[in-house]
C-alpha cells in the first residue's frame, strides 16, 4: 500500500500540467550542432588556411571533452533501472546516448574530409607532413636513424598473452596496436606500444629552404614497426586512442579522514584515468580479429568504435604554427593582433586613483588585461592596502596575477584566495598554484561542498587614516592572462560603495560556507541569481501587457535552464521582444508559433571565443547586468556565480553599443530556426558584410591611437570629450543614447529593513607610486619604512596569524 506521502506526490503530479516540448530541444544534440558550427570555420575559405586547420583541432578537442563528460555521465545513468528523463526533450539517458552515437559518424566523416583537403593545400605551399607510405629514400633514412637513436631506447613493446594481460589504456593516450604472427602455429597475438608522451610528438625532417617538413612520432614508430617485436611479425597495424568517462564528482567520492582537500583532488585525478571507456578511435587498418580483441578488452559495443584515416588527437597542430616559414605566415595565419590599451586609462598614473574617480570597463581580448594586473601589483606594494581577496577558477600556468598575490602576502598583507580545485581539466594546475600561494602566506580556501565557485570577483581594501576604501573587480571570464587574449569578456573595475559592501559580504559568506547571503546590488547563485533574471523578465512582461514597449537581450554561452526557458516563452507570448546571442547550447527553439514567435536567437563563432554574459532589460536597456553565469541549471542552482549591474553611464554605453555591434554581424553570425538548426544570417539587398569581431579589432586600434594622440601635449589644446568606443551611426552622435537613461537595479525580494546610513562617495586619492607591473617579482629599490613594517619575519608572521585566528574564533570578526 502506498504511504500518505506517496499518495500526495502522485496527486501533485496529476495536478501539474504536462510539460510542453514543442519549443525545446535536447541539450546534447544542440551541443553537437554547435561543434559542427565550429567545424564550419574550417570550411570557410575566407579564413587563412592554417587557421582553418586549427579549427579542425578545436572541433576535435571540444568533441573529446563532450564524450568524456556528457556521454560518459549519460552512459552511467543509462545503467540505472529507472533512468531520469530530460526535461527539454523527454528522452531517457540511453535514448540520448543512442542519438549522440547516431550523429557521430557524419561529424567525423566531415572532419576527416576537410582535414585532408587542408593538409593537401598546405603541402603544395611548403608545409608538409610526411606519411610512411610516401617517404623519399632520404626521409626514410632519417626516420630510421632517428628511431634507432632516440625512440627505440624509450618504447616498451608489449605482447598480450596469458602472462601479459591487456593493460589499462590511459585516457587520451596514443597506442600502436598490431596483430602478430607467432613463431609457432598458435593463433596470432596482439602487440601494443604506448607512444611516449615524454617525447616531442612533432619530428622535424630536413627540407629545402623556405619549406617545413615534419613527421609525427607515431608514424616514426609505424615506419620501423618490423624491428619492434623481435621474432614476431606484424600482420596489421593501426593507432588507437581510448576516451574514458571523466564525469566524476569529487564531492561524491568522500574525503578520507586526515586528508585535506588538495590531497583528495589528487586522488580523484588518478581515478579519472581508469574510468570506463566511452569510445575507441582507430586510425589505420586492423584485422577484424585484432579489433575484436581490443574492443572486448575495453568492453565497448561496436557502435562506440570509430575508424578514420587521419592522425588521432590533432593537438599537435598548434605546436607547428611557430615553424611556418616567414614568407608564408601572412597567407596562412591571421594578422597578428596585440590587445590594445584601454583608452580611458592612463597607464602612467596610479590605476587605483583612476578607478576611484570613475568606473572602468575592460573588454578582452580587444583591450589588454594590464590595468587589472597592474592594479593588483600596485596593491601588493601599497602601504595603504591592507587586504586582497579573490576567487580563482582557471589560472594561467605562468600567472603574473598569482605572483602579485604572493608578493602581497610576503609584504604582510591579508590575502585570501578561493581556489576552485574542481575546475574540470585544470585541477592539477590549480592544485600547484594553491600550494604556492599557501606557502607564501595566503589564506587559501576551496569553496563549498557540492557547489563549484565559478564567480570572478576580486576586492582590494585600503585604509586611509580611519576610513576604509574598497575597489571591486568583477568579470564575466577568468582572471587568466592567457585566455584574456583569446576569449571575449568584460571586466568592471569600480569603487561603488554599495557593490563594495556586497562584495565584502560575499567574501565573508564564502569564508563561513554560507551560500544564502542577501545582497542589494549583486545577484549571487545558487540563491539569488535566477530570481534576479525572473524579476527582470517579469517586469518586461508587465510592460508588454500594459501596452508599453518591452525588450530583453541576453548574451550567453548556453541556455538550458527549463524554468528560465519557460519564462522567456511566457515573455514572448506577452509581446516582449527577446534577442539572444548564444554561442553554444540553446535548448529553446525560437519562432515556434504561439510559443516563441518573438524570440530571436543568433550565434557568433569566429577568431575569438565569445564568452561574455550580458543580461539587459528594457527597450533602452535601463537594467544591464554582466555575469559569470550562463543560464544553465548547473550555473543558476549548483554553482556560486555573480551577476553585477553596470551603473556608470559611460560603461553602460559601451555594453549597449557592444550589443548592437553583435546584432549587426552578418558574416560569422548564424540564426537558430524553429527546428533547432543553425543557418547563415541573410543579408538584405545592398547590405555590406559586417564581421563584428573584425570591427572590434579595428576599433581597438583606432581608439588606442586616438588616446595616444590626445595624451600628447599640444599648445592651447581645445578640451575634447572622451573618445567614443564605437561606430557613429549619425554625425556628431558621440554619446550613445543609452547614456541618457537612468540606470536601474533589480531590487531583491527582501523583508523590510532599516535603510543603511548613506555612505559618502569616495574622493580621488593620491597614492604612493607602486613598482611597474613589468617588474613581476622584483622588489622595488628603496622600500619605504611602511612597507618594511609590513614585512615581519617568519616567526612574527606566524604568531600574528595565530592571534588573528583566535580573535576571529572568539569575536567572529576578521579585523
Indicate residue ranges for each PLM-predicted region.
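N-terminal localization/anchoring segments of enzymes in phospholipid and broader phosphate metabolism
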Residues: 2-552, 570, 574, 586-815
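Active-site glycine- and acidic-residue-rich loops that bind
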Residues: 562
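Hydrophobic alpha/beta core scaffold segments
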Residues: 577-581
